[in-house]
Amino acid sequence: MKMLSTKATCNSHGQDSSYFLGWEAYENNPFHHTSNPNGIIQMGLAENQLSFDLLESWLSKNPDAASFKRDGKSIFRELALFQDYHGLPAFKKALVEFMAEIRGNKVSFEANNIVLTAGATSANETLMFCLAEAGDAFLLPTPYYPGFDRDLKWRTGVEIVPIHCTSSNGFQITQSALEQAYKDAQTRNLRVKGVLVTNPSNPLGTTMNRDELNLVFDFITSKGIHLISDEIYSGTVFGSPGFVSAMEVLKERSSEDEEVWKRVHIVYSLSKDLGLPGFRVGAIYSNDDMVVAAATKMSSFGLVSSQTQYLLSAMLSDKKFTISYISENQKRLKQRQKMLVSGLQKAGINCLDSNAGLFCWVDMRHLLESDKFESELELWKKIVYEVGLNISPGSSCHCTEPGWFRVCFANMSESTLKLAVRRLKSFVTELRSTTTSNHRNHDNKICKNIKKNIFTKWVFRQSAQEANRKMQAER
């Protein structure tokens, strides 16, 4: 008799992806600067650890928030009791104002339109449950975050159809790519319910420009489908062009089609911008009352604790702090990104130009033995197990071109990043030396064969000439 459910035993979780296998390798041999200096450095984790000191400084100056007090009096019992899963009004108000602040206050958000979830993972899955049936499809531009194979598909039964983007235009979405993805879904007899984009992009570290967003809006309008804009990296934009939210474009186009207004949904989180993934704070923002109502009911399976909401409502309500934090955090991200990019360039490795995120999209196509994904995985294994760096291969992100890798830079100390770059540079130098040596040996072998063939032919000619002379002498 079958003891477990089909859901428990299905293979759609994506656990066998090289993205997760790299994590396993790291967990079995984690780098530590003193206890395990030769261990694997984790560069596959998109965490922002660069500004903890700013958060800790605020906490030290605001002890009531951290100790669950209001005006010096304990509110522990109030927070410890069951809370309505709609969320604390003070926190929802502070959160939507913070979201607007990150977007330069070009758009505003209504607290009643937001649904709190236990992180962006929960938010994206909840939207799948709200907008699609099992067997329906969402279109996602490649490369995309490897975790989406788990977050969007595993429990919902929703299918992902890739919108294939290429390096020829910096992996931007094109009209032809959108239409081809839609046709691919139809060929598979899948009903397309929407498009999901990450902006800024994970893994590219780039922002979508207004033209690209309008292209997507034109597409979803013509097809009558939804748009989910995952904007969890919106506060990490450290360079130009700046960040343009889907809500900003929607506001500009709202007079064209009222129905589209209800079919655009934003996913947000404090995991990346504030560096608080352990707090599990995510959100869905939608202009559709039915989506908000349904998502709110579903959020009871993944609530944000009252203690977390209370602490963060105080922090995000401190406008002087949030403005200063956003600016300083972006400066630190820019500095760290430059450190990685310049270090890789010295090793002969280039990156896609980026202006956001906690990672770079690194081009190692020239290090592959062939232009096949098998060659990419072989290179990845060497980098993980021989070099000791866990990075994410492009194939795990469904990239169409072998040889691209996502490399994170904000989840480690500066000294650890420098060590990682030195390791990679040494590996590339050795790889090139080996390749050059192999080519030289190959060339020498060819030369020897050529000389041998020439000598053999000369011997045959000499023998033939000698034989002719003997024949003539005999005559």
UniProtKB/Swiss-Prot annotation:
CDD domains: AAT_like. GO terms for molecular function: 1-aminocyclopropane-1-carboxylate synthase activity; pyridoxal phosphate binding; transaminase activity. GO terms for biological process: ethylene biosynthetic process; fruit ripening. Induction: By tissue wounding and auxin. InterPro entries: Aminotransferase_I/II_large, Ethylene_sulfur-biosynth, NHTrfase_class1_PyrdxlP-BS, PyrdxlP-dep_Trfase, PyrdxlP-dep_Trfase_major, PyrdxlP-dep_Trfase_small. This is 1-aminocyclopropane-1-carboxylate synthase CMA101. It comes from the Eukaryota. Pathway: Alkene biosynthesis; ethylene biosynthesis via S-adenosyl-L-methionine; ethylene from S-adenosyl-L-methionine: step 1/2.
